[in-house]
């Protein structure tokens, strides 16, 4: 599948109290193309159950599930993987998951990290944070000038992350971003219906004018 559009990322605090599955399904109905399951807890049994349920939802809606920082879980479920800079070897993950798996890499605000990730077999690279982020407030800041430098040098999808909203996403897409990764601007909502509305609005930004 072409990696372009809304990239929804879960948050265990935002999506507690039974909100995970209905809110994620709402995002998928709204057009999310990728879904990253991000849960840093040590409850492996629960994480497996949740990831299996999310995989079923993604399959139903024609989206791809990506697991954050757990190559073994990704391999067990036959889904994609996202690695941060301290989450282990990308080349080892590629060897484990195979040539067809989607594997993404966090590159912060450094083009050199992105080029290294490409060499190690990444399917996409992620730059950010571009704006103030509730999830990672101390992350290095990235600039739109970085996108101008990256686009001609990287021949794979570019993801932007970090405090992205419906107001700021269009400027990033205009600079060549293929995927906008969103957490709070999508899931910090009072209802699943509101999540779906927001997802449709983000997805519409990628439609031809």
From Swiss-Prot:
Organism: Pseudomonas aeruginosa (strain ATCC 15692 / DSM 22644 / CIP 104116 / JCM 14847 / LMG 12228 / 1C / PRS 101 / PAO1)
Residues binding 2-[(2R,5Z)-2-carboxy-4-methylthiazol-5(2H)-ylidene]ethyl phosphate, per UniProt: 133-135, 163
Domain of life: Bacteria
Lineage: Bacteria, Pseudomonadati, Pseudomonadota, Gammaproteobacteria, Pseudomonadales
The reaction(s) this protein catalyses: 2-[(2R,5Z)-2-carboxy-4-methylthiazol-5(2H)-ylidene]ethyl phosphate + 4-amino-2-methyl-5-(diphosphooxymethyl)pyrimidine + 2 H(+) = thiamine phosphate + CO2 + diphosphate; 2-(2-carboxy-4-methylthiazol-5-yl)ethyl phosphate + 4-amino-2-methyl-5-(diphosphooxymethyl)pyrimidine + 2 H(+) = thiamine phosphate + CO2 + diphosphate; 4-methyl-5-(2-phosphooxyethyl)-thiazole + 4-amino-2-methyl-5-(diphosphooxymethyl)pyrimidine + H(+) = thiamine phosphate + diphosphate
Protein name from the UniProt record: Thiamine-phosphate synthase
Example GO molecular function: magnesium ion binding
UniProt-listed Gene3D superfamilies: Aldolase class I
InterPro entries associated with the record: Aldolase_TIM, ThiamineP_synth_sf, ThiamineP_synth_TenI, TMP_synthase
Residues bound to 4-amino-2-methyl-5-(diphosphooxymethyl)pyrimidine: 36-40, 68, 106, 136
GO biological process: thiamine biosynthetic process; thiamine diphosphate biosynthetic process
Name of the gene encoding the protein in the UniProt record: thiE
Protein residues bound to Mg(2+): 69, 87
EC identifiers of the protein: 2.5.1.3
Listed Pfam families: TMP-TENI
Cofactor requirements of the protein: Mg(2+)
Keywords from the named record: Magnesium, Metal-binding, Thiamine biosynthesis, Transferase
GO cellular component term, pick one: cytoplasm
Pathway: Cofactor biosynthesis; thiamine diphosphate biosynthesis; thiamine phosphate from 4-amino-2-methyl-5-diphosphomethylpyrimidine and 4-methyl-5-(2-phosphoethyl)-thiazole: step 1/1
Family: Belongs to the thiamine-phosphate synthase family.
């Amino acid at each position: 599948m072409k990696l372009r559009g809304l990239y929804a990322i879960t948050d265990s605090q935002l999506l507690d109290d039974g909100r995970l599955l209905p809110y994620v399904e709402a995002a998928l109905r709204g057009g999310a193309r990728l879904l990253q399951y991000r849960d840093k807890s040590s409850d492996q049994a629960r994480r497996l159950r949740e990831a299996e349920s999310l995989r079923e939802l993604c399959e139903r809606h024609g989206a791809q599930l990506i697991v954050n920082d757990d190559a073994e879980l990704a391999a067990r479920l036959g889904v994609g993987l996202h690695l941060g800079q301290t989450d282990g070897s990308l080349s080892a993950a590629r060897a484990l998951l195979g040539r067809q798996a989607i594997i993404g890499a966090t590159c912060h605000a450094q083009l050199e990290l992105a080029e290294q990730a490409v060499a190690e077999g990444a399917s996409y690279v992620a730059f950010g944070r571009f704006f103030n982020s509730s999830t990672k407030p101390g992350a290095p800041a990235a600039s739109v000038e970085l996108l101008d430098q990256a686009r001609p040098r990287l021949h794979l999808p570019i993801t932007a992350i970090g405090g992205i909203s419906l107001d700021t996403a269009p400027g990033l897409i205009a600079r060549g971003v293929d995927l906008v990764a969103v957490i709070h601007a999508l899931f910090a909502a009072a209802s699943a219906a509101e999540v779906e509305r927001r997802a449709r609005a983000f997805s519409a930004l990628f439609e031809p004018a």
